Amino acid sequence: MVENMETSFKSIDLIQIMDKWQRKWDESKIFETKHDNREKFFISAAFPYLNGVLHAGHLRTFTIPETIARYQRMKNKNVLWTFGFHVTGTPILGLANQIKEKKEDIIWAYTNLHNIPMDELLKLDTPEAIVECFSKKATDAFKKMGFSLDWRRNFKTDDKVFSKFIEWQFYKLKDLGLIKKGSHPVRYCPKCENPVEDHDLLHGEESTTVEYNLIKFTSTFDEKDVIIPMATLRPETVFGVTNAWVNPDEIYVLAEVYDEIQKLDSEDVDLKYNGLWIVGKECADKLKEQDKNIKILKEFKGSELIGLKIKNPVTNLKVPIFPAEFVEMNIGTGCVMSVPAHAPYDYVALRDLEKVEEVGLISLIEIEGYGKYPAKEIVEKMNIKNQKDEALLEEATSKIYKDEFHKGKLNENCPEYKGTSVKDIKEKLIKDYMNFGISEIMYEFSEPKVVCRCGEKCIIKTVKGQWFITYSDENWKRLAHECIDSMEFAPENLRHEFHNKIDWMKDKACARRKGLGTKLPFDTNWMIESLSDSTIYMAYYTIARFINAGINENQLTSELFEYVFSGNGNLAEISNVSEVSIEIIEEMRKEFLYFYPLDWRCSAKDLIPNHLSFMIFNHVALFKKEHWPRGIEINGYVTIEGKKLSKSKGPVLPVLEVSETFGADVARFYITTCAELPQDADVKFKEMEKARDNLIKLYELAVLVTKEGIIEKELSIIDKWLLHKTHSSINFAEKAYEEFHLRKIGLMFYELINDLRWYKRRGGDNNGVLKEVVEIWTKLLSPVTPHLCEEIWELLGHNGFISKEIFPNVKIEYINEELELGEEFIRFTMEDIRNIKNVAKINPEKMYLYTADDWKYELLEFMNKNSEKNVKELIPIVMKEERFKRHGKDVMKLINDLMKVGVKKAIAEVEILENAKTFIEKEFECNVIIGGEDFNGKKKFAIPYKPAIYME
């Protein structure tokens, strides 16, 4: 009856099925929701940015919560699942300008990768046109994928009504003292004249701002007293400086340096003289943007500095400057401290110059496992010959720095700090150096290439009069840590990473001079930037349907939001001023209180250090503890046939293209089951085709079941086995959905396909059983492949939507582990028979199967009762039993053998083999005898679950 499952129904049109059920869902509005008496479930994903089409990365990140939302509905929960669209900031402005200028790379990317026809693309020369175009395409993509969203709650972040919500948020943060104004170093685009965030960048999205210490060495140059600052991330190493390095072929400058001191309550500055500095020309350009006024007096090559003696401000030692071509001018000042006792690069460079004896080595850190001069020691141990051995030098440096940080302590050459561990000294030294006036701060990017979407290279700029959110506030961090401790994480190991991100969080610029979005309500010259207006919008989802039904921005006062989200204020007065009825405001508050807190927030891992961490910060500041988020799910990235996604270079794989090519269900099934959460998912089109073929098999079985009808008959062993396997799957599937282990759903489905093949081989042909299997699996798969499952559900004669059905319950009477072990035993026995046949190269006429002696089953039972013991612990206990002891060495061998095959429950092997005798005979075309005469003493080799086999 299931033979036809091995062929595909080529006539099945998954696209047609997809369109049919999307239309029915849309007409019935079954995914619209409001507060009621059921248990609620609120899940959301980071909304997409509308500067392109939704792609494969979006597909994975969004399909995971979509699947969980459908599952939770089947658990009879009231599910809130919806989407907004992010348009804040400058990327859309930049894209409009690039299209207007007909930039070749942009035109190519959007016509070839985003599939925008040329005539349509050239019309997208305004931000408004781009937002309209891509919001429609995103909506179409969500609908084409069958997302079960409540569309009444959709919004864009430049909607005037949403801006009023953000104004409330920022007024409240300011009232709490969490927004301040001052000078602040930010990533900055000189062309856009704006701070830039991760979403604004073409390259360097994960770059951070790194704080370097400039140690102010002094000397005399051109008969003038000069400061030669040297950048370091390790201020303790100043104690071990023996010389300095400059690049002889690069350009340096002698410049008057003035500190820019911002006047109180003003963006104007006073200038304070800071001396004559010698730095690289590129460094001077950077310092101009970081609170320094630079007046260049002279440009010269680094070779003029060679041999100059400079004074170490910490040790007062005078050390020479040597030439080094390895000095990079794009990082730091172009002048580098040399610490050869602890830096392999410095030691090898000095050795190449034959200067080691001249300057000597100064030890400053004691490390367990190393001698006095770790760099010299590791260079000699790794046989590093010269500076060209870059890979080895990098490895040596990494190892020493790691060991010094974790295990090192400062020695007697650091008098006041002797005995302090390296990992604990940095902040104290920075503070001390600053107090002594011998150190300053300079900022660099953590990555060499940071480029704005407009194509301009970004810089770090100290913006004056900048508004920033004080994420460095220790009390605020304490609340954020408390929230993280109370949350669930999928996967769980993310908890530690979030704690780390909170610890390292610094103040963040929250506004810029231009862009789309919301004006800063208390300083309208500034626009709130994109990572600051996207932290609590999940709360807005809860009330968006009321606002979208006809409330305008003038009615949305901060007092109204304060009442809805905090319960503060006089309701009658708020209603009177806003002209929103008391009834509506009360409904808004009820809806918020019902659906909040957010149960799960879903995103890809790139948002951990920014959006997701900011979400936690803002929730703990603005909402009561009972409304803090409960869970965060993070997935890995997506590649296409091994290639990294790129909006500008490709591949992209638009979501609409996937749905039109494979159908939504195939795409949904594949993208959610091809990899575990933290792993990156690689989309392989051949595998998607295989997934499609296997899904069609379930439909084929449903067709065959309905065609042939149901004939009542007694359940056979193999019928009971299939029912056991199917009902066992219910618990496994439930656990997988609850824990976001969606890959397991796919593996279970593929196991079902194999189970059905085995059922057929074993002679299974009970239509009633097969129908029950199809019905259960249609429900189990419905959250992942809803269109196909709706079609099968209808085919099986059911009314209504499977999307609104209750998740199946396990029928305990069908659960029988012995049946599963029995079929597994038969399958493995047949594999052993096949292997023996192949090795011996015979086709037997008779085959004898010998099961194990009774004492071996007794030992198996004994091992089951002591399953927590390992082999070493088990053997002494077993040998105390006389019934086992008399079998001597055979016992120890059997214990090891049973451990290898897996310690399982003892089963009635003789009875199972007798029941399967006809099946085995048919498979191998020979007579099978269970037991019988012991030929060649074979029986003694039988162990539980592994019969001995004799063929003739």
From Swiss-Prot:
Recorded catalytic activity of this chain's protein: tRNA(Leu) + L-leucine + ATP = L-leucyl-tRNA(Leu) + AMP + diphosphate
Enzyme Commission number(s) of this protein: 6.1.1.4
Keyword Zinc listed: no
Segments carrying motif 'HIGH' region: 48-58
Residues given in the record as ATP binding sites: 647
Keywords linked to the UniProt accession: Aminoacyl-tRNA synthetase, ATP-binding, Cytoplasm, Ligase, Nucleotide-binding, Protein biosynthesis
Annotated localization: Cytoplasm
Motif ('KMSKS' region): 644-648
Keyword Nucleotide-binding in record: yes
InterPro entries registered for this protein in UniProt: aa-tRNA-synth_I_CS, aa-tRNA-synth_Ia, Leu-tRNA-lgase_arc, Leu-tRNA-synth_Ia_arc/euk, M/V/L/I-tRNA-synth_anticd-bd, Rossmann-like_a/b/a_fold, tRNAsynth_Ia_anticodon-bd, Val/Leu/Ile-tRNA-synth_edit
GO aspect biological process, one term: leucyl-tRNA aminoacylation
SUPFAM superfamilies registered for this protein in UniProt: Anticodon-binding domain of a subclass of class I aminoacyl-tRNA synthetases (SSF47323), Nucleotidylyl transferase (SSF52374), ValRS/IleRS/LeuRS editing domain (SSF50677)
PROSITE patterns: AA_TRNA_LIGASE_I (PS00178)
Molecular-function GO terms, alphabetical: aminoacyl-tRNA deacylase activity; ATP binding; leucine-tRNA ligase activity
Enzyme class: ligase
GO cellular component terms, semicolon-separated: cytoplasm
Superkingdom of this protein's organism: Archaea
Pfam family, one: tRNA-synt_1
Similarity annotation: Belongs to the class-I aminoacyl-tRNA synthetase family.
Protein name, entry field: Leucine--tRNA ligase
